[in-house]
Amino acid sequence: MSLSDGIGDFLTRIRNAQLAMHRETRVLFSKVNSSILKILKEEGYILNYEKQESDSIPSLVVQLKYYDKSPVINDIARVSKPGCRYYSKCKDISKAYNGLGIFIISTPKGVMTDYNARRLKVGGEVLCRVF
């Protein structure tokens, strides 16, 4: 099985699992997916994640977070797509949903939130937005 957009598949699995009210979901392992999950955990959007290996295929098990029986993640969407990449300079990075959400950006200094990218004055590829 080949994926043309691994990050898009990763985000869709999380979105679908949240809408179906699952406690956890399994996504394919990659360094970028792991970095995004680290940010989501730090920002309080998920409970936890861990790497597991079944049949020599590494994957990440994500424990989803809910508040009053509704998903904490209201919207998670891909911004930069394989067919249309979206790059932003540090001064052009806006706040997601007027500061209520986050953009996750891949920079030369690693994957980080929009707030950290503005603070460190680095730009990069805007991977996704989370609200």
Swiss-Prot record:
Domain of life of the organism encoding this protein: Bacteria
Matching InterPro entries: Ribosomal_uS8 (IPR000630), Ribosomal_uS8_CS (IPR047863), Ribosomal_uS8_sf (IPR035987)
Key word Transcription regulation present: no
BP GO terms, sorted: translation
Transmembrane feature ranges: none
GO molecular function (one): rRNA binding
Complex and partners: Part of the 30S ribosomal subunit. Contacts proteins S5 and S12.
HAMAP family: Ribosomal_uS8_B
Identification of the protein by name: Small ribosomal subunit protein uS8
Annotated organism of origin: Wolbachia pipientis subsp. Culex pipiens (strain wPip)
